[in-house]
Amino acid sequence: MPKSVIIPAGTSTPIAPFVPGTLADGVVYVSGTLPFDEFNNVVYPDDPKAQTRHVLETIRRVIETAGGTMEDVTFNSIFITDWKNYAAINEIYAEFFPGDKPARFCIQCGLVKPEALVEIASVAHIAK
């Protein structure tokens, strides 16, 4: 099955061997997305809402570059560093998924940079 690499303009160059997204057989797989600027610096330290918005906007760019929309998202994996930020993260998350919500899970864990508060990976099925 052929796959296409998805790298939207303005996306940071990953600091590990992966790409922001891949498209295969109508499915977009978005790598774990952190609140990084194009130079891999964490944006909005100590602001879980702003970091979540930045992460979801980056995910949206990956999915739109592949030809989809956020309505095509079927699953999200959410990683947070502290449960105290859960409500703030969910508030912004709900703005990006106002209708039928995708399935998801959320766990607390450490992230690659200590200033990062949230990481999200997504799967979207693009209508053919």
Curated annotation (Swiss-Prot):
GO terms for cellular component: cytosol. Coiled coil: none annotated. The keyword Ribosomal protein does not apply. GO terms for biological process: nitrogen utilization; uracil catabolic process. SUPFAM superfamilies: YjgF-like. InterPro entries: RidA_CS, RutC, RutC-like_sf, YjgF/YER057c/UK114. This is 3-aminoacrylate deaminase RutC. It comes from Enterobacter sp. (strain 638).
